[in-house]
């Protein structure tokens, strides 16, 4: 049957398809189009024209909007709008605390109201709840442990981790390493500490923590060794870098370790995980969470040199706080030079201060702060509460809360930026101001000089036993300390957490009266008291908060694990504390 080929009615070939069109020649002309088909084709053509016109208008509208969008983005992201049309003042964006201090100074020092008693600062109590069953039997079944014989099931291999950062970032890595070793049924090699250019501390594990205590405390839960055995190392020519190294994703889940890490460990008998900061999710099974608790609150005890001096510092603070019943306030003040530079905040030093901070940022962090996508807004940093509180601001806040000039304050800090200038107002408001440098002799501190983590361990211990702890800038130190205090003081962090966005607004109001400021500070203290006893809801293994900041309820199970792990014994192993202190004897565990 012959197929029909239709000629193009308006073609230039007079209705003939050429051979170049890959068509076939037809002798008969095409039949004329019916009227209905002509109407349909005309309607289709008009519809296409209308659609094309609409599309053109829409695209043209977008084309006109593009320059406007680009200009808006340029103003918001590349250069502040205030830089083009004149500086726009944002309330709280300028550091005016020295001005208001001078204005209110007479009122502060003439305030005759009753001083806040340190023994009655904290009003809220943790509500007692029905204790949940501890995962004791679960631990036994998962680890194959026998607490009588301290026997463990055959291991899957050796786990090497390298912890970086400062004291408490390393502490987090150690606790996570114990948990991962338990999860993989591995033998954990004493964690290695990486040297960091910022922290500049070459300390090893044994310089900070008691290795023997660490190993013995975890006996029967996770096996700990100091080194990988020779029979393993000979396979890698005694070169640690030749050992299979795994880069684990941040906040890795239990399934990730079982699926990705365990097979490699089983195959080679040893693995190395580096870096190891935040490499385990917070949501883990109860028996893994319990290992974190045991490591943090039982196994990690500061080394003898640190614990010995720390005990002396606590004793001296208690002695100097006789006017307040041996109780004192500790303040974690992050106003060191590098912290001020990193925050990208400006105070009252003008261009000279800005230039100085630019040099420090470039020296310590290279080009991190000069990237094109990095917009530095000191004013917005301050409004959003991201600027470190100055010693003056801390002093005014505490005086407003009701702490008088008889209050003993321990300052946990490195070298303060421009100390002569910035520490003077705080010293004026609180004459009983002490640091580890003022409490210890130069000879006692000599072995610690040049080791930031060892110095931080001293601050950690003295702050841990204070009646009131004040955090000013966040970070691992206060988060770990608040969790440790919750564990130590029956669930209450006993910590002042300033509402910094609110505080900066108050401290730039030149019309504010001292009575108004005091009222706001007492409300802030009350809010810290309320939040201090809050326990996040934990459903099964769905934990979104840090076990190190909120250790309850899981870590309460530590007291049920061993009959010889008594309250007193526990205190002695929590960072080298001692039972003679009034604070320790009054702590409820």
Swiss-Prot record:
Keywords annotated in UniProt: Carbohydrate metabolism, Fucose metabolism, Glycoprotein, Glycosyltransferase, Membrane, Signal-anchor, Transferase, Transmembrane, Transmembrane helix
Chain positions covered by the region annotation Disordered: 1-37
Localization of this protein: Membrane
Stretches with biased composition (Low complexity): 10-23
Residues bound to substrate: 332-334
Transmembrane segments: 68-88
Protein topology in the membrane: Single-pass type II membrane protein
E.C. designation(s): 2.4.1.-
InterPro entries listed in its UniProt record: FucosylTrfase_pln (IPR024709), GDP-Fuc_O-FucTrfase (IPR019378)
Gene Ontology molecular function: glycosyltransferase activity
Keyword Transmembrane (UniProt): yes
Record-level GO cellular component terms: membrane
Flavoprotein in keyword set: no
Glycosylation sites: 112, 136, 239, 405-406, 564
Main localization (coarse): membrane
Protein's pathway: Glycan metabolism
Any GO BP annotation: fucose metabolic process
Family to which this protein belongs: Belongs to the glycosyltransferase GT106 family.
PANTHER family documented for this protein: O-FUCOSYLTRANSFERASE 10-RELATED (PTHR31288:SF8), O-FUCOSYLTRANSFERASE FAMILY PROTEIN (PTHR31288)
The protein's name: O-fucosyltransferase 11
Organism encoding this protein: Arabidopsis thaliana (Mouse-ear cress)
